[in-house]
């Protein structure tokens, strides 16, 4: 930033022109980077206007400030704050110096804690300087072409060295373009796509101001530009001298479009080499003024033809055959001259690490502290005067509590030191051998569980006969179908058993009431038609005679079947008739039973039969099936 004697060289109305331009386009800030009067070939802060968010408003006037003056007042307050901090930093230790710092600091209406993020960005920008050809303003000044940068907060630091600051302040769009012998930079917190009408609007705002060249252009000599090589001289380009036609230029004001202007322009166009010689030696100041005006007028009326998504450099052409630019030298020659010029000027490094050092030094200046947590290891041995006292651990801090003088400072100190320790402790716990062992145990247990599950599925696949696939879903589906089929078969067998039991009980009841067969009736009638008491029995009453009591109350007592593995034991008692034993044995054979022991006896018209047999073949008859088949044979009359 131009301080002290340098700042007086900036025109007074430049800030007002910046204010009008920035307010017209509604951007956050505007900066004019001018050629340094103390360092050759360097661009530094010339002036600026802040139009962004304001965190705290402080005024030293009793009356209300108008809306259009708020931005100017805020910009002045930020400049005063930076100057006060700079003076405090540069002052040496001592009573006299301390009183000077106190007086200077009291003049500032703002303090660092009153600033918003965007104001911090604007304030820190005051400390930046750029070599010509380096940094965004330096490249713009060297090339004479505007640069439009979108996504400045995420840009590479090699492209935009203040990307870290832009990220903290949410500055997304930054535009630089050459103007008035320096570089105008504008920025906003919104994402604005490339539009050359914005630059045109800013330039038009300067041109529409009341005779800006009367005050701005003559002040160019105050910048000591005569002692510094012009960007066009450094790059080896031809001077951007507009070649006007015989018609007067339509954009120029009437006071400028005179015959003298045409004569001076022709002199510049025809004798360009002599112009450069005069400019280097310090002569022909009026020609320089005309040259600068022609350059700015041509930049105002021409727009860009090329654009890109993020960073673009626009190239202007002649409009309608009225303006034509001189030829440029080759790029190789320009680069060689740049390197030669850089040997004569003080270089500033803009690699990311040096940018961090520069940023930390600015923060150190503002906060007046060199604490290791804030500045990092680069400033460990800094011995700078600070308003903060260095905190040291006392004897009580070893027990976990720090001795503090104020509750707020104690809370802040505890947050700064304890919170990182908590996170570090959690990280160490996650990285500890116990945690790794526990994680490994979980993996082993999960592997074993999956192996057991696979074994169960393979066992189930072997049990279910209809399973042909090996995937788990198919095995489960086939198992469900098989169980449903078994359930249906059980229901069918139970219903069949109930119907068989009902039928058997009905058959036994009928047999008890059934009369003797015809042979027995005939023999009974032939033998004796009288009963034991001498009474004659009617033939019609013979059918009503009760059968002999067998001593069995039901089928459960007449048939017993026992199964012992592959062996079956059948115990049967039924009414004896001719051929009944043979029929029973045939039924047992049909049931795939191999009889190896048969015991039978008859008495009182009953057949008692005990058969020991074994299953033969793959077909196995259940006890229910055996019982049902024997009941159909044994109780048929």
Swiss-Prot record:
InterPro entries: bHLH-TF_ACT-like_plant, bHLH_dom, HLH_DNA-bd_sf, MYC/MYB_N
GO molecular function: DNA binding; DNA-binding transcription factor activity; protein dimerization activity
Location of region: Disordered: 497-521
Region named Binding with MYB0/GL1 and MYB23: 541-637
SUPFAM superfamilies the UniProt entry points to: HLH, helix-loop-helix DNA-binding domain (SSF47459)
Knocked-out gene: effects: Plants exhibit two-branched trichomes instead of three-branched trichomes.
Chief localisation class: nucleus
Factors inducing expression: By nitrogen deficiency and UV light. Negatively regulated by MYB66/WER, GL3 and BHLH2 in the developing non-hair cells, and positively regulated by CPC and TRY in the developing hair cells.
Pfam family, any one: bHLH-MYC_N
Domain named bHLH: residues: 437-486
Tissue specificity note: Mostly expressed in roots and flowers. Also present in stems and leaves, and, to a lower extent, in hypocotyls. Expressed in epidermal root hair cells (trichoblasts) and moves to root hairless cells (atrichoblasts) by a cell-to-cell movement through plasmodesmata (at protein level).
Protein name: Transcription factor GLABRA 3
Encoding gene (name): GL3
């Amino acid at each position: 930033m131009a301080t002290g004697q340098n700042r007086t060289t900036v025109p007074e109305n430049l800030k007002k022109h910046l204010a009008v331009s920035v307010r017209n386009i509604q951007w956050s800030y505007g900066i004019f980077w001018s050629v340094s009067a103390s360092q050759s070939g360097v661009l530094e802060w010339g002036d600026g206007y802040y139009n962004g968010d304001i965190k705290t408003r402080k005024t030293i006037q009793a009356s209300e400030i108008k809306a259009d003056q708020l931005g100017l007042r805020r910009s002045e307050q930020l400049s005063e704050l930076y100057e006060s901090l700079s003076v405090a930093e540069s002052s040496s230790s001592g009573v006299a110096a301390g009183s000077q710092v106190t007086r200077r600091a009291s003049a500032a209406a703002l303090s660092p804690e009153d600033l918003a993020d965007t104001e911090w960005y604007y304030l820190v920008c005051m400390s930046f300087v750029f070599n010509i050809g380096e940094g965004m303003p330096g490249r713009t000044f060297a090339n004479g072409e505007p640069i439009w940068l979108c996504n400045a907060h995420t840009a590479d630091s090699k492209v935009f060295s203040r990307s870290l600051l832009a990220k903290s302040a949410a500055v997304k769009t930054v535009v630089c373009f050459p103007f008035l012998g320096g570089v105008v930079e504008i920025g906003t917190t919104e994402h604005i796509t490339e539009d050359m009408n914005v630059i045109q609007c800013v330039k038009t705002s300067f041109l529409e101001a009341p005779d800006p060249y009367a005050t701005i252009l003559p002040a160019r000599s105050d910048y000591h530009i005569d002692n510094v090589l012009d960007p066009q001289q450094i790059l080896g380009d031809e001077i951007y001298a507009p070649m006007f036609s015989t018609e007067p230029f339509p954009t120029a004001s009437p006071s400028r479009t005179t015959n003298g202007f045409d004569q001076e322009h022709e002199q510049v166009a025809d004798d360009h080499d002599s112009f450069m010689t005069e400019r280097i030696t310090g002569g022909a100041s009026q020609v320089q003024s005309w040259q600068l005006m022609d350059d700015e007028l041509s930049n105002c009326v021409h727009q860009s033809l090329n654009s890109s998504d993020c960073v673009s450099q626009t190239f202007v052409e002649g409009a309608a055959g009225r303006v034509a630019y001189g030829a440029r030298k080759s790029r190789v020659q320009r680069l060689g001259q740049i390197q030669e010029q850089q040997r004569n000027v003080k270089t500033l490094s803009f690699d990311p690490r040096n940018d961090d050092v520069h940023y930390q030094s600015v923060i150190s200046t503002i906060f007046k502290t060199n604490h290791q947590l804030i500045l990092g290891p680069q400033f460990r041995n800094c011995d700078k005067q600070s308003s903060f006292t260095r905190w040291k651990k006392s004897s009580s801090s070893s027990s976990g509590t720090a001795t503090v003088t104020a509750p707020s400072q104690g809370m802040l100190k505890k947050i700064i030191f304890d919170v990182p320790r908590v996170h570090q402790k959690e990280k160490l716990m996650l990285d500890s051998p116990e945690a790794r062992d526990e994680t490994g145990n979980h993996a082993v247990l999960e592997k074993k569980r999956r192996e057991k599950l696979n074994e169960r599925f393979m066992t189930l696949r072997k049990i279910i006969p209809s399973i042909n696939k090996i995937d788990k879903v198919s095995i489960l589906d086939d198992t469900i179908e098989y169980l449903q089929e078994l359930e249906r078969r059980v229901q069918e067998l139970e219903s069949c058993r109930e119907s068989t039991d009902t039928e058997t009980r009905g058959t036994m009841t009928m047999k008890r009431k059934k009369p003797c067969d015809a042979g027995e009736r005939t023999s009974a009638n032939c033998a004796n038609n009288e009963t034991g008491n001498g009474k004659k029995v009617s033939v019609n009453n013979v059918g009503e005679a009760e059968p002999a009591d067998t001593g069995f109350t039901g089928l459960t007592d007449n048939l017993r079947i026992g199964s012992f593995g592959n062996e079956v034991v059948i115990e049967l008692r039924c009414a004896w008739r001719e051929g009944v034993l043979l029929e029973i044995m045939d039924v047992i054979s049909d049931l795939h039973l191999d009889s190896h022991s048969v015991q039978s006896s008859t008495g009182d018209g009953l057949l008692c039969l005990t058969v020991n047999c074994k299953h033969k073949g793959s077909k196995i008859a259940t006890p229910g099936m055996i019982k049902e088949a024997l009941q159909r044979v044994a109780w048929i009359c």
